[in-house]
Amino acid sequence: MSAVPLKNDKPVEAGVRTVTVLGATGSIGDSTMDLLRGARGRYRVEALTANSNVEGLVKLAREFDARFVALADTSYFDELKNALAGTGIEYGVGESAIIEAASRPADWLMAAVSGAAGLKPALAAVDRGATIALANKECLVCAGDFFMQRAARAGACVLPADSEHNALFQALSSGNRDELTRVIITASGGPFRTWAAADIENATLAQALKHPNWSMGRKITIDSASMMNKGLEVIEAACLFALEPEEIDVLVHPQSIVHGMVEFSDRSVVAQLGAPDMRTPIAHCLGWPERIAGPAAKLDLVSIGQLTFEAPDFARFPALRLAYDALRTGQGATTVYNAANEIAVAAFIAEKIRFGAIARLVEATLNGWVRAGNLAPLASADDAIAVDHNARNMAASLLPQIAAKAS
């Protein structure tokens, strides 16, 4: 049994639904809170969390009358305590408080804590059989098989909140899983879609941050420029929908209007289209199994004029090829892929390596991991976190060598 519902057969819940938002002050959290703001009376906020943004968290807690708030950074305890004095809102700090927020009774939970820190809170929600809008990549990239199996056993419902996976989720409801022949994830191509390899190699931070279509955080925008983000999405799709690498294709689609397609055995292809606005997939998750009104712009195909598609260039964007390699190697390798990329992106932002060295550091770390024979299956969250930690250390140790080769 899959934790992702491939048929819209869940009964509609009557009355006010309670919601928890993990990562409420981040970009995904901000979009989620905006949707909740427009649907007052339909939802009640149980808990909100943030990393260190006390002011933003307290402002949201007061606005939505949250019952509990949590900060990951323990150094802000006194500031949080003082800001909530007299409100009656419960609060806590540290990992245990974030897990408590996820464990509290809520009908629906947005899992948008970034990084490996989001894994244990998401598992806490899974274990109580919650409906989870999943926006944390690490739950799938670092612990996908384990996470999805645990969700299925607990009766949790996992709804993909990322635009591409939500598109596949919607399209898959048009047929049965055994009728699927492949899924197609689209990619904008990022700011370097038409650049020569030599120019991509030496791209600056400012150039990498100029995404043509989406407004996103700094890290994910750089990942889009390298197509590392699309590689991560390939891995996520495999975990969410129990797909083999050969069942997942990527097409470059510069307009970012078609977000995903599913091909069935009769060669019918069902696509999901929409303006590039993260509030659309989040609204789909928030309203599911119904649909709620969303604030995104109407899709005007006449003004867009044309939709074009290109095959991805694995030579100019090796990060995408590496994702398929890691997926075929196994769960530990996908964890290494993600961890090494985070080290590489941080080094690029700090101007320690060229843009083109991001993928080279990831490849070197993957090769080193495989040579060391570190291929045991992951059986727990602690296993995944340990692999993530060790892979980061390996990538950091390889960084000077990669930087020297590029200089």
From Swiss-Prot:
One of its GO terms (biological process) is isopentenyl diphosphate biosynthetic process, methylerythritol 4-phosphate pathway involved in terpenoid biosynthetic process. Its EC number is 1.1.1.267. It comes from the Bacteria. Pfam families: DXP_redisom_C, DXP_reductoisom, DXPR_C. It is an enzyme of class 1 (oxidoreductase). Mn(2+) binds at D162, E164, E233. It catalyses: 2-C-methyl-D-erythritol 4-phosphate + NADP(+) = 1-deoxy-D-xylulose 5-phosphate + NADPH + H(+). 1-deoxy-D-xylulose 5-phosphate binds at K137, S163, E164, S188, H211, S224, N229, K230, E233. Its cofactor is Mg(2+); Mn(2+). The keyword Manganese applies. The keyword Cytoplasm does not apply. Disulfide bonds: none annotated. One of its GO terms (molecular function) is 1-deoxy-D-xylulose-5-phosphate reductoisomerase activity. Keywords: Isoprene biosynthesis, Manganese, Metal-binding, NADP, Oxidoreductase. NADPH binds at T25, G26, S27, I28, N53, N136, E138, G217. Pathway: Isoprenoid biosynthesis; isopentenyl diphosphate biosynthesis via DXP pathway; isopentenyl diphosphate from 1-deoxy-D-xylulose 5-phosphate: step 1/6. Belongs to the DXR family. Catalyzes the NADPH-dependent rearrangement and reduction of 1-deoxy-D-xylulose-5-phosphate (DXP) to 2-C-methyl-D-erythritol 4-phosphate (MEP). This is 1-deoxy-D-xylulose 5-phosphate reductoisomerase. The lineage of its organism: Bacteria, Pseudomonadati, Pseudomonadota, Alphaproteobacteria, Hyphomicrobiales. The gene is dxr.
